[in-house]
Every structure is written in C-alpha cells, then in structure tokens.
C-alpha cells in the first residue's frame, strides 16, 4: 500500500494486517516496543525509586542493558512515522551510536558500583567509582546535546528523555554516595546543583519539543486529528510520563522512596476505517473531533458503569450511544452521571457494563464495524471488557486489543496483575449523514492514580489535588503544563480549592510534614484546613511573573512550619488560596527522629539562604520581612544540637547578619518598641493606654497592644514621623509589619495626601494545640520549638458596611511615593496607627518603613503631578492664612486692655470671647485631620492665639463671683428646693431647667460692700408666666430680672436693664459650630462625605486631596462651643450691695424656665 500524501492518516486498523505499520518502504514489526519499554520504566520508577544498587541495576536491565541498536531504531521510527519526517541517515546513525556507547559505558559503571558496594572502604574501588562516574557524567554531557539536533528535536525526543533520565540518576548517585566515594563536600554540592538545574533544563526541553511536535500536527481534517491524537498518546507515555518523575531525583527534597501518581488521561484511536467512502471535507473537522472526544480538564474520576445503547443501519447493528456513571477519588456513593453520548438507540436492549475501585476494567477487545470494508458505519459492533476477576461482553469480542497501545507494565505476571491502565471513560464522535460515524473512543488513566488517596507511613506520598472529590465554587481545573503528570488547580479569586479525602494506612497516630508543589505569580498566602481544627497558615512565595507560561522553574515547594500528627484513619483536606496560585499536589512526608533532624536542617539551610540576594550575603531580598527573619531565627534555634551543632552555629550567624541588614534599611526609629513618648521629637508618640509587651509565641521581639476607646474623639493612637533627611527623591517607600490580631485598626501614611487602610485580622488564640505539653520554657519564655499551629494568614472580609475592606492578612503593607525632597520644608512622612471604636483593638510588631524602588514612567509622572497640586494648594493656603490670622488676631487683641494680655476690657463678654475664638478656628491646617494631636503647618500661630483665648476665658471666669454659673458641674454650689434638672443640650451646653413653679435654686455669694456689680443672665422662658432671677441682701435692696414669652419690652425704673438677642450678638454663628481645624475640603469644594479610603498609588485618584473634616478635632482647651438656639436672651442689671453677702435666687411662676448662665461681675473702678 502506498501513501500518496504524507499528511494523510493511515490508521493501523485500516490495513489488511493491523499489526503492521508502514513507514516509507520499511516494515517494522511492532509489539509496541516503545510503549512496552516506557511503561516498564514508569513502573520501575514508581516502585523502586531509591538510590542504590537495586535502582542502578534495574535501570541497566530495563533500558541500557536491554535495548540494542534495533530497539533504539524503533524509538526513532515511532515518531518518524507520526510526524512524517525521516531523520537523515547520518544523524540517525550518530544518535544510535551515541546511545550504544552510553549503554556500554553504563554497564561498566554498574559493574564498578557493584564491586564498590561489596567493599565500600577499599581505596582502589572508591577511586574506580570516581573514575567511572566522571566518565559517565562527561559522556552524557557530550551526548545529550546531540539528541536535540536542530530540525530533528521532535524525532529524537523519546531517546533524549532516556538519556536525560540516565544523567539525572547518576547525578543523584553522586549526591548520595559521593562522600563515600571520596569526593569533597564542594564537589558533591556542585554536582547536586547540576542535578537540580538539569531537572528543569531537561523537563522544559521535553515539554517544549512535545508541544512543538503536537502543534505541527494540527490540521483541518478528521484524518489529521487521528494522527494528532496518536502522537499525543504515544509521546505522553514515552516522554511526558517519564518527565513527571524527574523532580523525584532531587535527593534532598525526596530523600526516601516516593509514591508518585499520574492522573493524565490518554485516548485510544477513533474506530474509523471508511475514510475513502466520502471526501475528507465531508467528515467532522479536526476541531469538531477534538471538542467532541477530548474532555475538558476535570477532577479525576473512575468508572462505575457504562449503559450502552445499540443502533442499526442496513443490516448492521453497532454501538450507537452510551451513558457513563463514575465516581471521584475516595468516594463511591456519589455517582456522577454523564450526558448522553450519541443516541439512545433501541435496536437491542441496553447493556450495562460495571466496574469498581477494586475490580477495574484493564483491557478491551473491540470488533470494529466493517472489517470487510463494506460497512456503511464507522464504529464498534462489539467489545469485550476484561476486569481483574472476570469479563463482560457487549455483543461480541474482537481483535482490536487495547494492549496494543497500552500494554501491561509487567509482562512477567498475568495481565490482570501486571496491567498498566484502567478504563475510566468513553466519549463519542457522531455523524449521521452519508457514511455514518458512531465513533466510541475509550479514555484511560494510569493505574498509579488509585481510587483512594492512600498515605504511606514509610514513603513520601504525592497526591495531585486534581484527585479531590469536590471542586469548590470559583476554583477551576486547568490543563497541566505537561510535566506534572496531569492537570492542576487554581482560582481567579480568594477562596477554597476543593475537598481532598485521604486515608492513612499505617499505625496511628502518625506525624507528617505537609508540603505543596505550586506556582505563584506573586507573594501569596493560604490556609490549609482539615476536619480537625484549627487551620494552618502557609505562604506561597512568588515563582513567576503574571502572564508567563508555566515551566518547570515556575514550580516550587512550600512546607508547613511544623509536622501534623493524625490520629484518624481518614481525613478531608481543603486549601484556601488567593488568585494567581497554581496547585499541583500535596505531599505527606513521614516524620522519624533522624529524618526530621535532616529535614529540618535542609529546610533551615534553604530558608536562610533565601533571605539574601546572593550567596555572598551582601544584601537582603526586598520581600524578606523583619517578621520572617525572626521566624527563620526560631527555625534555626530549634535545630538539633545532637545532629547538626556546627551547621546550626553557622546558620545562626547568617540569620544575625540578616537581622542587622534589616535594621539598617528600616527608616523607623525604635522599631523594637523600647519605649513610647521617650523623646519629644524622636521615636514613637502615642496615647497613654498603649502597652509594650515582650515576645510571645507569635512575636520574637517587643510588640504593642492598642486597646479600644469609649469616645471616638479621643482615639488610641501611635505615630512617628520619617524625617525628610532619610528620604530619597522620587522613590517609593513601603510600610509593612505583622498584625497578630486587630479590629478597626486604621493605618495611615501621609505626605502629599493620606494613604489609608482599615484592617481587621481575627486572631486564633494560642499557637499551640491543647495537646502540646511544655508550651512554656523553664524560665517562663515561650517554647518556640514545641509543635505549634500556623496563623491563618488570609481571612474572609469582615469589614462592616460603609468601611473600606482592605486586606485581612496578618502581614500588611502600604506604599507611598515621595517626590522632590526639601530639608528646609521637612515634610517627611507621617506613619499613624489609630483606633477610634470601643470594640477596636490591635497587636502588632516587626514594623518596617523601607525603600522599595525608584519611580519611573507613569508612577514618576503621577507623583510629580501630585506634588505640584499639593504645592499649589499650599500657596493658596498661605495667602488665606495671612488674611484669616490678621482678622483673628485683631478679634483676640480687642478682648484685652493691653499687649500683656493680663486684663480684659470692661465690656468684654462671653459672646465676644466665643466670637474671637471662632475666628481663630478659621485658621486651617493647624493639626492633621487624620490625627489632631499632630501639629500641622499652621500649628504655631493657631496655638499662639488659642492660648490668649484660654487666658480670656480664665480672666472672665475669675470676674464671675457666682460659682458654677454655667451649670457645667450640674447643681454643685447651688441650693435646691423642689424638682429641678440640669440638662445637656446641643451637644455640649448644660442648662438649668425649672419645670415647676414651686421649685427654687439659690446661692449665697460674698461681695464687697459699696462696690458696683453687674448681674447678667442668659435664659429662655417656655409657656405662660415669668421666670425670675433675683438678687438681694438680708434686708431689702432687692432687684430682679424677669423673663417671659411675650414680645413687650420690659422697663425696670430703678435699674439700667439691657435686653439682648443672644444669637444676634454672636455675629457669624449660623447653625451648630464645631471648634475644630478644617482641612482642604471647605476651601476647594471637595465633598466632605467621601470616606478616607485612599486608592492604590497606581491609581490617579490616589493623589486627589480628599481629606475629611474631623469633627473630633478640639480647640485643645475647652469643649466645643455651641450657640444657643433663637429665643434665648441676655439681660443685665447693676447692683450695689450694702453688706458683704448677697443671695441669687432663680424661680418661675408657671411653665418652664431654662437658664443658660448666671454671672455677677465686679465693675471696674
């Protein structure tokens, strides 16, 4: 048979002899040797992946001592046939010769290893082993590049992966046995570095080349898809499945036997034989076949049953459609029912084929319709399904054997024991018109993907998270990158991933380290949960940039800080992650004393080295926080003195160096909280209720506790200014730290504007489980080496309505950009922490303010624009302040008789003082709106005038002989008869209320006989009758002021009486007045209702000045003055006592009498 078009598919079952493959003019007898060898190798890697003689000899017997030139030629021919590209004779012969040479060299290597293993202290054998390793390593370094010759990378891929696998295995050998062979530590470490680097190099080449070949086979027609799918299946087995084991060669990450699972699916050929009965364009297209046959990424499932429907055409009956029932890993009760594939034909009764976790279907024998090439249907007439104990037949058995493509992995035992794949699903491609297609395509999973996630007590167990039984809302399964052995999971927003059920097979309780293989586009955090509380926080450091493709180097490992002890045979796990994190698998590492010590040391070495930007430890990585350094210090301190004392000392010195570098780059003064308010102009300033506490199970160093407050006008606060001299021009800075727990904690960074976040971080109590003993050390210190829980690093949003919901991580950070610096202006950056609610609280420490990066591009332009806007507003403010200050000073000066401000003018009254004070408070930017204890640009002139206002009030109070005449102290100093009340009105004013005519309030006052006094009363009368304030002596000499609710002017013949409309006297007092310092809003028209939730520095609105007016900013001396409503009047009379005592009496005839103040003032001489 000739092939006229090399791009045309020639399926093996189109031929008169389906067991032959035609390649050009050659015939290759196939027992699918490549698949046999590859699956045998996979089985070996799965079950015997332990360094030593057994592995070395096994690799020789399976591959390098078994395969000869003819078998290597079959490896090359398989791909040549698929991609219709023949390797040039020279390149082909060179590749086979190189492979043969490597085989011969490896036989010598194995023989030398066997001799050394019998006498490991023999110097000659040790030297021989070094010679053989060096020769083997050099040969592989030379040979492997020849297996990726340009233009033949795809054709050579299956032999490339075998050579790469061999190279990684001998590099692991020297990493394990090198010291006993006589290599020094530096050489061993260098070869281990080669190993870890080449794992990525070889993996990426295999995956990239596989994808290149696959893309090359994409086409338009169904025949193109058949070749495409065959390439995908065959190279998944011969290349990608082997690559999935490459990370296990990292002996320091996987020091013991490791159980790996392959969760990918492979699809057998479409039963399609009559392609010549109709033009190719009339068949389903390439894309239609791919969409119909290949399932989208999904959680791993296992077959429970098929329900098969039979259809017919002419005299032929065939598989016309089916339903699939399946179950997820670890659960057999919740069946998943597929949609109907094909049609629900009724030519014959439906047939049900069953399977189970313990009895899987491992083989099919299909009878393809029209083997005589006359059947008008391309499909299946019958299938025999073989499981591990019996067989089931749909209509009839046939010669098309699934073992031809998916042979057993172990031919030395019966197929029911040595099978490699289990049937998991079947899809369908249908065409009804013309020559009919009823193409059932079986999909298979590797047997390593077990129906239950069993965790071994003696192996490292890798469980892909795609084996979860439930996928959380918002989580998704995405196509794997090719080297993970299956698909992976991710989320597009913060939330749960999906529930994974595992079974512990060993004696319980058993302890394991929990590790995750992941990729992340940024530094992320997550939470690991299982059915026994509590949850465990875990970090996912950045491994790649957003938008980059997933490569081998994109994936890393992250481990829970301490092992977890499990006491139940079955547990369910879930992982709470942020967006941009990709999860491959969870790994369970059994804990033993020696292994734990070695594992702890290796982990400590990795995390210590990861602190620095380079191996010479000259600088810290920017994303290494001060809190993280403290935790690394704890990790090093907990290393075993018995196993690794010298290494512990070395690591401890490195961590101390890292801590010193962290202190040097931190621009905050006293970051360790040695004291608050210790120095007036340096360090931390704060409210008196803040406490400093020593290290505990969360913090290694001091931390601060901020309690709540009962009055939001008096918040709990902590602040510090970063001096201008420490800042660089056009640079971004970052404030960051660690919060143990908080509620309503407000964080501010202020320069040109305020960056603001409200952070709520629920704590989890003690970090130690209740079952842990010795939580406290012998001297009362926290035992940081005791097994402890991890903090929950990211939590659901818990902000109340109307508040900005910032991040809720224990780790917080806030950026601010600095433009031009000016030492004379000394603008600096204010760092503020504030709580203004009763339920608020916070515990925080490890605070840092450090340089992040210079500003470039758009960020630079934005900060320049913000700086210009700020300076324009500052200039406007200065002009305004000049005018306002002049008016305010004139009002204040008018209250006094001289510039010494020690005497008031005779006619100065309370309304004049309040009016002057209001003018003073028109001076804006006296204090920061965010925290009114921090002085602003106009603080000096404001406090100058405010001090004189205080003096005026003091002098005025001294002139009033009546004690508690404003009733601010209730009824203190007053004699009371009957029922009266003192009520607070209009926020801050206390007034005397006399509601009954029989009630009376009086006070005895000492005076100077013969001197003149002014009695001044401000009051309001409700209802009928009169309110009276009387002044008298023991005998006669009585005067009174009367108040009523009528409009007639009252005449007092014996005295000079003035009736004043009090509200008019207060001049500009319109509505409620709050004595506070305004921000920019009033002058520039900004909306004061906009909350102070400033956006990211990357958004333009971040630089818009939107500071709110703070109603709690006081005049720093007395309570807010609120003018009285209309209706209150002030009346005066002159009184000349004849004795040294007078009585002031207040009463009424009916209705209600409300008195604001009573004053008795000595006249000037």
UniProtKB/Swiss-Prot annotation:
The encoding gene: cry1Da
Name assigned to this protein:
Pesticidal crystal protein Cry1Da
What additional remark is attached to this entry? Toxic segment of the protein is located in the N-terminus.
Keywords, alphabetical: Sporulation, Toxin, Virulence
Note the Gene3D superfamilies from the entry: Galactose-binding domain-like, Pesticidal crystal protein, central domain, Pesticidal crystal protein, N-terminal domain
Q: Which organism is it from?
A: Bacillus thuringiensis subsp. aizawai
Q: Which PANTHER family match?
A: ENDOTOXIN_N DOMAIN-CONTAINING PROTEIN-RELATED, PESTICIDAL CRYSTAL PROTEIN N-TERMINAL DOMAIN-CONTAINING PROTEIN
The uppermost taxa in this organism's lineage are: Bacteria, Bacillati, Bacillota, Bacilli, Bacillales
Cystine residue pairs: none
Q: Which SUPFAM superfamilies match?
A: delta-Endotoxin (insectocide), middle domain, delta-Endotoxin (insectocide), N-terminal domain, Galactose-binding domain-like
Which Pfam family is one of this chain's hits? Endotoxin_M
The family note in this entry says: Belongs to the delta endotoxin family.
Organism superkingdom: Bacteria
Its job: Promotes colloidosmotic lysis by binding to the midgut epithelial cells of many lepidopteran larvae.
Offer one example of a GO biological process linked to this entry.
Answer: symbiont-mediated killing of host cell
Q: Which GO terms describe its molecular function?
A: signaling receptor binding; toxin activity
